[in-house]
Amino acid sequence: MHIKEICLEGFKSYATRTVVPGFDPHFNAITGLNGSGKSNILDSICFVLGITNLQQVRAANLQELVYKQGQAGITRATVSVTFDNSERNRSPLGHEDHSEITVTRQIVVGGKNKYLINGKLAQPNQVQNLFHSVQLNVNNPHFLIMQGRITKVLNMKPMEILSMLEEAAGTRMYENKKEAALKTLEKKQTKVDEINKLLEKDILPALEKLRREKSQYMQWANGNAELDRLKRFCVAFEYVQAEKIRDNSIHVVEEMKIKMTGIDEQTDKTQGEISELEKQIKALTQAREASMGGEVKALSDKVDSLSNEVTRELSKLTNMEDTLQGEEKNAEKMVHNIEDLKKSVEERASALNKCDEGAAELKQKFQEFSTTLEECEREHQGILAGKSSGDEEKCLEDQLRDAKISVGTAETELKQLNTKISHCEKELKEKKSQLMSKQDEAVAVENELDARKNDVESVKRAFDSLPYKEGQMEALEKDRESELEIGHRLKDKVHELSAQLANVQFTYRDPVKNFDRSKVKGVVAKLIKVNDRSSMTALEVTAGGKLFNVIVDTEDTGKQLLQKGDLRRRVTIIPLNKIQSHLVPPRVQQATVGKGNAELALSLVGYSEELKNAMEYVFGSTFVCKTTDAAKEVAFNREIRTPSVTLEGDVFQPSGLLTGGSRKGGGDLLRQLHDLAEAETKFRAHQKSLSEIEANIKELQPLQTKFTDMKAQLELKMYDMSLFLKRAEQNEHHKLGDAVKKLEEEVEEMRSQIKEKEGLYKSCADTVSTLEKSIKDHDKNREGRLKDLEKNIKTLKARIQASSKDLKGHENVRERLVMEQEAVTQEQSYLKSQLTSLRTQISTLASDVGNQRAKVDAIQKDHDQSLSELKLIHAKMKECDTQISGSIAEQEKCLQKISDMKLDRKKLENEVTRMEMEHKNCSVKVDKLVEKHTWITSEKRLFGNGGTDYDFESRDPHKAREELERLQTDQSSLEKRVNKKVTAMFEKAEDEYNALMTKKNIIETDKSKIKKVIEELDEKKKETLKVTWVKVNQDFGSIFSTLLPGTMSKLEPPEGGTFLDGLEVRVAFGDVWKQSLSELSGGQRSLLALSLILALLLFKPAPIYILDEVDAALDLSHTQNIGRMIKSHFPHSQFIVVSLKEGMFSNADVLFRTKFVDGVSTVQRTVTKQS
């Protein structure tokens, strides 16, 4: 493959489209003046080949490859190179079917860089692969020989020359890949070390721990299975017992009902006997009354009559004596009142004298005139109206009529009351006599009633003394159900939150026996309490990873935990006695907190005082700020310069570092911990409440049983007493007692009414007497008094009118004193007349009382004689009552028997009710057990059968219940420690372990393979380098001899080494080998270096070679030798040579001459080869 044509447009100095056609397949030369665009043609070829090192084409960037860098209106550079691809055996891979290949590269100023292969867009790597397949790697261009490269070769060290040989042989790429492979081996070894470290420190300990936890889990799971079997056994026994009670209670209830029926029949029979006895008693009583009733009745009537008469007369005597005593007391009272009034008159007379003495004569006269005038006018008006005085509303005749009517009414009512009371007293006496005859019977009934009341009171006291209230157990059971429901909900919530916070849980095994767990305080996050939820995000950012640190009391405790605590994960431990905190100074705190927008993070969390050092270490050096401005002020203020965090979680460091942005779930950890703490607190409170309720229930169960029994006993006693009371109320003595009590109350009430009416009657009679006297006196003096009064009034008015003005000041006092004195005087006179009348009446009453007392004594004597005769007859009747009493006693026995039978029946009723309730409860219990445990239906047939899980004989149910409770306690305790996810975790850890071991084995295998291949390739490299050395050495000598006849050159190892230690260039002139290259001239040295480069190129010839002024330092003869050498040694490669010397391009087959015309390069082709 060789170049046929190059087309340039806008590339460097080629502004317009310029085609450079007809390249010779062998030797082409390009010549022209400096700056005419010779090297730009070579640069265009490198440009198309995809060069990335732009210094090779003398440009700093792709824009400099455009004509005048796009400033002349040309904004793109395009180069197309057409290759002859007629030799199929040397064609690029994938392009064997194309006879020509055109590769185009175009760049646009500020735009894209694109490649085209045969007019189709291609990627840069496609173009590179195309040229790499024919040994044209433009980024390592051994086919491009520049003048500077020759100079470098002369100064190379042995190893550098060996490196060139390796590149020619193709082993250099192997060395690069070998170095990369060795680095890969190092990385793999590092990976293996990491895997081993991970296995040793994390995976294997975790796997071993999970294996132990899995063993615990299997123990817990097996325990659950045993627990389930025990639960089923206990539930089955409970079911069988409830079913047995339910079925048996029906028969027991039926038997009790039969007994109750028998009791009812016996009661009816006894009731019939009682009826017969009543008839018998009635017959005996009638017979007794027939024989002795007449005489007894006559005497009884006489006694009753005399008794009533004694009572009546005695009542009169008592009333008369009371009246006498009352009148005597009234007389004494009147005497006392008269003395008081006398003193009052004297006092008022003295006061009036003093008033008169202290006033002027005119005042005295005016007072007298005024008083006299008023009295005269009042008296005059009263006389005209028919009154005794002027102060009364009715006239004397009306008052007298009303008083007489009141006297008549009072007298009538007194007579009626006396008649009623006589009748009641007679009846009361009869009833009392009958009541006395039944006294023995009443005492017996009373004693029996007291005994029954005492029984009831005794039972009631015992019942009331029980510390149990009705409904208390039901209320507790209801509370227990409520607490259980709430507890289950809270427990689920705690488990859910605990699962979410598994990474905060700190679990460890006691490092030593009897280890004090109080030394381990816990994880920081669980030891703080945040009251303000809005600051949780800021606090979480402030603490960061320290939230998961574990606080212990001393460093020794931490050391024990790390070494022997069997920790599940890596933890950082904070010993309280060693931790050092950097608390913000108080001065800075005060300066900041005073602003109101910033608070020390430590002040926002609650904690135990013993954790103060650790909390200061975690939260003591950062401020939490409400706003971003406040956070900036705290962080960057010279006086404060303290890290700060906003409520949103943005961090400001005094160094200027800011951290912020979106925080997914900021503060969730502390919020979840807060919720977990609240849930655990509530759960513990409800568990405590539930425990208290359970304890109360357990404590109340015996009391409830005793309460139920006592209640039934009390009901029976009260029912028994109520029956006795009903029977006692039907007793004749009870009826008589009620009648006597009622009569006594009526008599007492009527006596009270008589006393009131007698007082009223006396008062009305006195009023009548007084009024009659007043009317009589009034009629005699009326006319004379009227005339005198009118005359006096006329005179007094005239005098008063004349002196009224002067007397006005003393009138009120004088008038009052005169009126009071007159009133007292009148009252005194009235009382004296009343006292005289009263003493006369007292004398009369005393005589009447003596007569009445003699009458009462005579009647009482007759009554006592008749009563003695009646008692003798009653004694005789008592003998007849013995038989009646016997019948009554028999009747009482029958009644007692009925009462006992009713009591027995009540007991049976209560027992039936209890059994029915027990039957109902057991039925409900059976249904609930079946509903709650669905397996009962399918396994019921096995209950109680030998050889099954429900063999109640071989296994004691009570011990099974105790074992169940113990196992539940053990399982509950184990459940708190067991890791329920351990199976999945163990499988995952085991998979990770197996995966790591697989990776490790693969890496170990790859290492072995790589090492083996490297060893094999090292041997092949030696062989290939040796072959290459021999071939290059031969061509090196041949080419140098051609360029400089009479000389020889070779490559040989340093003294005492092999060719793998490097190669040195040796030169001989004739047969003499030079010791150093410094003996050569500059031209000779250039030819030597060029010979070496061409010898290396000849080892694996490329299809194209480019030489850029490699003959610059040579004279003409040496230049001609280069041309001859190229023709002789590279017959299958195309050479494109840039040279200014004719000796070089004279040997070329085609010569291209460049010129610079009007700022644009042009090319002219000349064929020098003869056909």
Curated annotation (Swiss-Prot):
Tissue specificity statement from the Swiss-Prot or TrEMBL entry: Highly expressed in roots and young floral buds.
A GO-annotated cellular component: nucleus
List locations, semicolon-separated: Nucleus
GO BP terms in the entry: cell division; chromosome condensation; meiotic cell cycle
List, for all copies, the residue spans of the domain called Zinc-hook.
2-1158
Q: Where is it chiefly localized?
A: nucleus
Task: Determine the domain of life of the protein's source.
Answer: Eukaryota
Q: Which residues form a coiled coil?
A: 172-510, 674-1026
Residues bound to ATP are G32, L33, N34, G35, S36, G37, K38, S39
What's in the keyword line of the UniProt record? ATP-binding, Cell cycle, Cell division, Coiled coil, DNA condensation, Meiosis, Mitosis, Nucleotide-binding, Nucleus
A single GO molecular-function term is: ATP hydrolysis activity
* Sequence ranges assigned to domain SMC hinge in this UniProt record: 518-635
General function of this protein: Central component of the condensin complex, a complex required for conversion of interphase chromatin into mitotic-like condense chromosomes. The condensin complex probably introduces positive supercoils into relaxed DNA in the presence of type I topoisomerases and converts nicked DNA into positive knotted forms in the presence of type II topoisomerases. Also involved in chromosome segregation in meiosis.
Assembly? Forms a heterodimer with SMC4. Component of the condensin complex, which contains the SMC2 and SMC4 heterodimer, and three non SMC subunits that probably regulate the complex: CAPH, CAPD2 and CAPG.
What the record says about its domains? The SMC hinge domain, which separates the large intramolecular coiled coil regions, allows the heterodimerization with SMC4, forming a V-shaped heterodimer.
As for family, the record states: Belongs to the SMC family. SMC2 subfamily.
Q: Which PANTHER family match?
A: STRUCTURAL MAINTENANCE OF CHROMOSOMES PROTEIN 3
Q: What is this protein called?
A: Structural maintenance of chromosomes protein 2-2
The organism named in the record is Arabidopsis thaliana
